[in-house]
A protein has these predicted regions:
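Activation segment signature within eukaryotic-like protein kinase domains
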Residues: 121-122
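Conserved short submotifs of the Hanks-type protein kinase catalytic core
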Residues: 92-106
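Activation-segment/catalytic-loop signature of the eukaryotic protein kinase fold
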Residues: 88
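Conserved N-lobe ATP-binding subsite of Hanks-type protein kinase domains
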Residues: 34
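Protein kinase catalytic-loop region centered on the HRD/HxD motif
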Residues: 127-137
Length: 200
């Protein structure tokens, strides 16, 4: 894959992705991806995550696509407390994942709220993590923004982009045996991972 085979694919409200999904809202944007709220021909809402390969150096496109495909497969685990991946495709050489749309926002407003719902939410998060772990997956990106609420109020884990597979090593190591890549958000990393980053 090279620059000539990847098109720039930015979408505005009202435009169609692959003549199938109509964009109704931009939900978020990350380093290499953008998430849209889209509707299909039956007017059903979904979240569509587009990997913007046109912004990525050619030499890292292949490993990035491999990780994106693994994200899709992780999202196919059948559990009510995980945001489900429903479709995978490409547009202009850029891959996308279509997922359940969660209309209830994320966990952030509950932090420090003292809400009586928190014990149930924690239970649902743990069930989601258990579903991942029993299939050899490690989320590695658990934070309030990655816990979404479905329309029925159920909490579900999302964003499996940096999820690990206990049966595969995707983290490169340097000549000293230390990881070259550290996955996760610093503020939510366990102390032992932060200590490894510091060389302790």
């Amino acid at each position: 894959m090279n620059n000539r085979t990847v098109d720039r694919c930015d979408y505005n409200v009202g435009e169609y992705i692959n003549n199938r999904y109509r964009v109704s809202q931009t939900l978020g944007e990350g380093s290499f991806g953008k998430v849209y709220r889209v509707t299909d021909s039956a007017s059903k809402d979904y979240a569509l995550k587009l990997l913007r390969l046109w912004e990525v150096p050619p030499e890292i496109r292949k490993p990035l696509m491999e990780r994106f495909e693994m994200e899709f497969k992780t999202g196919q685990i059948d559990c009510d407390y995980l945001v489900r991946s429903l479709d995978y495709g490409t547009v202009g050489g850029n891959p996308y994942i279509v997922m359940e749309y969660c209309s209830g926002g994320d966990l952030t407003p509950y932090l420090g709220s003292g809400s009586s719902k928190i014990p149930l939410i924690c239970q649902q998060i743990l069930i989601g993590l258990h579903a991942l772990h029993t299939r050899g997956k490690v989320h590695r990106g658990l934070k309030p923004e990655n816990v979404l609420f479905k329309s029925n109020g159920i909490a579900a884990l999302t964003d499996f982009g940096i999820a690990g597979d206990r049966n595969k090593r995707m983290t490169e190591r340097n000549i000293f045996g230390k990881p070259n890549q550290i996955f996760g958000t610093y503020a939510y990393m366990p102390p032992e991972q932060v200590n490894r980053m510091r060389g302790e």
